[in-house]
Amino acid sequence: MFNLGNLGEMMKMMKSMQENIEKAKEELRKEEIVVEVGGGMVKVILNGLGEIKDVLIDKTLLTEDNHEILQDLLVAAFNEANRRTKEVMGEKMTQAAGLPSNIPGLGNLF
């Protein structure tokens, strides 16, 4: 039969988990991730939620001759920033939800 006492405990656990996740989001918002490509010629700075804060480009890339190189470096930087953000966010949210971190692919859910 259905036990209402267990339901109450589950609701408390869910509320606690939700509070932990909100706290983790605030921590991620404050966290800074720096991605450098091209030997530091392009740098992307973002927070743990993936919000881009700054893009720094070496002035030597800002010429017509370097147009394609700059495009390639920007693509590489944004792809790496995306990968790193997912990694950091997955770890933080898995921890906040109280889930084991050794389950493959679990971090990709967040």
Curated annotation (Swiss-Prot):
Output the InterPro entries linked to this UniProt entry.
YbaB-like_sf, YbaB/EbfC
Q: Which UniProt keywords apply?
A: Cytoplasm, DNA-binding
> Where's it mainly located?
cytoplasm
Q: Name one GO molecular function term.
A: DNA binding
Q: GO cellular component terms?
A: bacterial nucleoid; cytosol
Subcellular location(s): the record lists:
Cytoplasm, Nucleoid
Q: Which Pfam families match?
A: YbaB_DNA_bd
Q: Note the subunit structure.
A: Homodimer.
Q: Name the family.
A: Belongs to the YbaB/EbfC family.
Q: What does this protein do?
A: Binds to DNA and alters its conformation. May be involved in regulation of gene expression, nucleoid organization and DNA protection.
Q: Which PANTHER family match?
A: NUCLEOID-ASSOCIATED PROTEIN YBAB
Please identify the protein, giving its name as recorded: Nucleoid-associated protein PERMA_0533
UniProt organism field: Persephonella marina (strain DSM 14350 / EX-H1)
